[in-house]
Amino acid sequence: MKNIVKIEQLELASAVVELGKKVGAGLAAIGLTGAGAGVGIVFAAFILAVGMNPNLRGELFKLAMLGFALSEAVGLLALMMSFLILYS
């Protein structure tokens, strides 16, 4: 009887750990929404600025690409953390 109880407790503990991994990975993936919003803001500002002053398009495009890269880097870090939590 004691062995059965220990096995059930071990299975319950294993299920709780798996649940914690899935919840943690989901919470870590929330950072991807911020990256998506950041990219949208960067390109909205770029389009608005080019509309106001088309002569600065080349300079503004470089800055927009820099903003895009930084926003996506944060999103990729969030995705990496999510995968690390889920598969480790």
Swiss-Prot record:
InterPro entries: ATP_synth_F0_csu, ATP_synth_F0_csu_sf, ATPase_proteolipid_c-like_dom, F/V-ATP_Csub_sf. It is found in: Mitochondrion membrane. F-type ATPases have 2 components, CF(1) - the catalytic core - and CF(0) - the membrane proton channel. CF(1) has five subunits: alpha(3), beta(3), gamma(1), delta(1), epsilon(1). CF(0) has three main subunits: a, b and c. SUPFAM superfamilies: F1F0 ATP synthase subunit C. It is a multi-pass membrane protein. Mitochondrial membrane ATP synthase (F(1)F(0) ATP synthase or Complex V) produces ATP from ADP in the presence of a proton gradient across the membrane which is generated by electron transport complexes of the respiratory chain. F-type ATPases consist of two structural domains, F(1) - containing the extramembraneous catalytic core and F(0) - containing the membrane proton channel, linked together by a central stalk and a peripheral stalk. During catalysis, ATP synthesis in the catalytic domain of F(1) is coupled via a rotary mechanism of the central stalk subunits to proton translocation. It holds the Pfam family ATP-synt_C. One of its GO terms (biological process) is proton motive force-driven ATP synthesis. Keywords: CF(0), Hydrogen ion transport, Ion transport, Lipid-binding, Membrane, Mitochondrion, Transmembrane, Transmembrane helix, Transport. The record marks E72 as: Reversibly protonated during proton transport. GO terms for cellular component: extracellular matrix; mitochondrial membrane; proton-transporting ATP synthase complex; proton-transporting two-sector ATPase complex, proton-transporting domain. The chain crosses the membrane at residues 30-50, 66-86. This is ATP synthase subunit 9, mitochondrial.
